[in-house]
Amino acid sequence: VEEWKIAKTWVLVHDMGSPWAVEYFPWAYSEPEKGRYDFQHADLVVEYAYAEGITILARVDFVPQWARPKDTTTRYLDKDRFSDFGDFIYAFVSHFRDRLRYFIIWNEPNITAEWGYRPVSPEDYTELLQIAYTRAKEANPQAIVLVAGLAPTLEGEQSEWGMSDLLFLQRMYAAGAQPYFDALAIHAYGGQLSPDDPADPDRLNFARAELLREIMVRHGDAAKPTFITEGGWNDHPRWTKAVRPAQRNAYTLRAYEKALDEWPWCQAVCLWAFRYPRPAHSYSDYFTFVNADFSLKPIYLEVQRYAHGR
């Protein structure tokens, strides 16, 4: 990505009124060979965000070719390579010790597409989390380590596609995850439902975040915060899971209000997605706040008015 695009993106994030942002730092980009680190691009991203006063939640995954078997996806990491990921976390957290504090370990490990198209395993992810947490704290004891945002899904334990986010988190606790994270990342998509649609284990909606929070409380983690690191609504004119643009605007602002007024345990709401580097030419383009050419969408202007009016 050209430097001017990085700079412009962070200016727009700041001007919209957002103090937080989730940024993706692919492991493969910064460690193309074992032990050879290249943080040049990551440095640009962090420096421009820092200049605009934005606090970054750094998501780290994307396995380099040298750390996985041939013909596997960038989400495939064997257990005997978990220590390589831990080494990278140590190097990454050390490098950004004075500039980054929040680190999200992996992404949606409860669905097979994000776990290398293998059966998902809360126990294996807990082992990976333990290694990453330990190495992050070695690099910076003040680092805040977040459990990966889990994909909201109703899949059962034996599904070929994944596992319910609620069940996955419960099994993580059973596997001993509690000492190895400081906060929980949550993915809170609304579908076609209002943010005030009540939480229900058999329903996917924005308020499902409350059910994940209840699991934390039951396991003695009431003092740990959560961060919504993905979520929101889509306003594609023909996608079956989309809402109208006016609904998207209203639901988004109500989601911010709900988190502020009703969820003291939620420290930030970061919705998907600010901007894509290029058009996807599909429904996913209608999750963004800013077009690839940097033109502003109505949702951006609505959030900007809301943020500056509080």
Stretches with model-predicted labels:
Residues V1-Y24:
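Boundary/entry segment of secreted carbohydrate-active catalytic domains
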Residues K8-V13, D38-Y48, F85-H95, D124-A132, ...:
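A general structural detector for well-ordered alpha-helical segments in enzyme core domains, enriched
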Residues M16-Y37, H41-S159, G191, A222, ...:
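Substrate-binding cleft and catalytic face of glycoside hydrolase catalytic domains
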Residues E33, Q65-A67, R81, H95, ...:
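Aromatic-rich peripheral "rim/lid" segments of glycoside hydrolase catalytic domains that contact
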Residues Y48-T55, H95-L100, I131-A143, A175-Y180, ...:
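A structural motif corresponding to the C-terminal end of an alpha-helix
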Residues F82, G86, V120-Q247, P279-Y300:
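Noncatalytic carbohydrate-binding groove/subsite architecture in carbohydrate-active enzymes
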Residues R101, D182, T229, Q267-W272:
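A short, local hydrophobic-aromatic micro-motif
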